[in-house]
Regions:
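Extracytosolic ligand-binding ectodomains
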Residues: 2-6, 14, 22-422
Length: 422
């Protein structure tokens, strides 16, 4: 029987499964089944990106016909957002991770989108020897000490093993690159805002530290209460400071749309003041929510970890075209990284298959896959060939810079690649 891949909410029954382009019978699955769990927001402003990442995993698994080394792959999609807020919720993320590790067929956990959510789930998957692969988390402290809080990343590794992997560069690279770009663009004074969340404050802190090192004056690095609809009090301070750049560490759900709209309302517009942010803002939903008039008025710049789709070559270019053909739309920012993570997992299962078959229990199966992922080398990825280092990070640091320009269509503007950043 063919089953379609479906998204299920965090409280849905564990039995809601999906087999990608495969047939769940004993002939096609001689060695049984393995399950991959995904977890990120699938509602509110995050629904387009969440769907894009889900599609990316789907793409990677569908390339195998749903069967790897005699094992049928089933994908269980979970939503870690709260129905009340539409944003990620720590309690929901913990429930998702616990649901995955309690499933004797679960082999890998794919997620999260928000770095704060990863802080919740990594220790849970680590205790279960389950590999966790993220398509989007970039907070440095999840894997390394640079740019991290005290105790990180060890506090996320209760077993002492590295089980968390990300095929995307971390913010200690992106935040630094953003500050250097601002310096090269000729900005004289920057006012940093952050959403006081793990990702947003983390990248803002790295931007600040780098700016001070390279001689770019920083007026302040101020945390905002992003739940407040009126950000004009802080923007009035920004205007009085004389800063010619506002840098905001955050994501689209945590105040960026309001900040940009109200920057225009208080006169913080180009050429007097411009706006820059990290890849957590590289979403069409930002343009819709902030309005193109406001975005264009601030002459926005956004940094992104990796290459823009149109600049990819080889595997990246092929994946981009395959995604568009399969889903009839452009990939979202992290959709191809979800595909990359899925392919890493498929490759690891192939290499670990003999150990999985000999394993005495699910912990040994998971450990075999974890070790295989950790040993990933010379992987032909969307941004070229790369390796995982001892922290579970990729060893490339390609970054891109985007601006926003006018465009035809219902939105009225779009992100456009501007430069490769180093």
């Amino acid at each position: 029987m063919r089953l379609s891949r479906v998204a299920i909410p965090a409280l849905a029954l564990l039995g809601a499964l999906a087999l990608i382009d495969g047939t769940a019978d004993s002939q096609q699955c001689p060695k049984g089944k393995l399950r991959l769990y995904t977890s990120w927001p699938m509602q509110g402003a995050m629904l387009p990106e969440g769907t894009g990442m889900k599609n990316g995993v789907d793409l990677a698994v569908s390339e195998t016909g749903g069967v790897v080394a005699g094992y049928c792959l089933e994908v269980v999609n979970l939503d870690d957002a709260s129905p009340q807020t539409g944003k990620w919720d720590g309690a929901v993320e913990a429930e998702n991770a616990n649901k995955a590790v309690a499933d004797p067929l679960a082999i890998v956990y794919i997620g999260t989108y928000n770095s704060g959510a990863a802080k919740v789930s990594i220790p849970i998957t680590n205790r279960a020897h389950m590999a966790q692969v993220t398509p989007a988390n970039t907070y440095p402290g999840l894997t390394k000490k640079r740019g991290a809080a005290p105790g990180e990343p060890g506090i996320y590794r209760p077993t002492g093993l590295v089980n968390y992997f990300r095929p995307i560069p971390a913010d200690d690279i992106q935040g630094a690159v953003g500050a250097k770009w601002a310096k090269r663009m000729g900005f004289k004074k920057v006012y940093i805002l952050n959403d006081q969340e793990l990702y947003g404050k983390g990248i803002a802190d790295v931007f600040e530290a780098t700016a001070k090192t390279i001689g770019l004056p920083v007026v302040a690095n101020e945390g905002i209460d992003w739940k407040q609809p009126d950000q004009k009090p802080v923007l009035t301070k920004v205007r009085a400071s004389g800063a010619d750049l506002v840098y905001m560490g955050g994501v689209i759900e945590t105040g960026a749309q309001v900040i940009i709209r109200q920057m225009k309302e208080v006169g913080l517009v180009a050429p007097r003041t411009r706006f820059m942010g990290p890849d957590g803002l590289l979403e069409e939903e930002l343009l819709k929510g902030a309005t193109c008039d406001a975005v264009l008025a601030t002459d926005m710049r956004i940094t992104f970890a990796g290459l823009p789709f149109e600049k990819m070559r080889g595997v990246g270019a092929k994946t981009y075209e395959t995604y568009k053909t399969k889903y009839g739309k452009e990939p979202t920012s992290y959709a191809l990284y979800a595909a990359e993570g899925g392919r890493v997992i498929v490759d690891a299962i192939k290499r670990a298959a003999p150990q999985i078959e000999k394993a005495k229990d699910v912990t040994e199966k998971r450990e075999a896959v974890r070790k295989a992922i950790a040993s990933t080398k010379n992987f032909e990825g969307i941004n070229g060939k790369w390796n995982f280092d001892e922290n579970g990070d990729v060893d490339y640091d390609t970054m891109s810079g985007f601006k926003v320009v006018k465009a035809d269509g219902p939105i009225g503007c779009k992100f456009q690649f501007e430069t490769i950043l180093e």
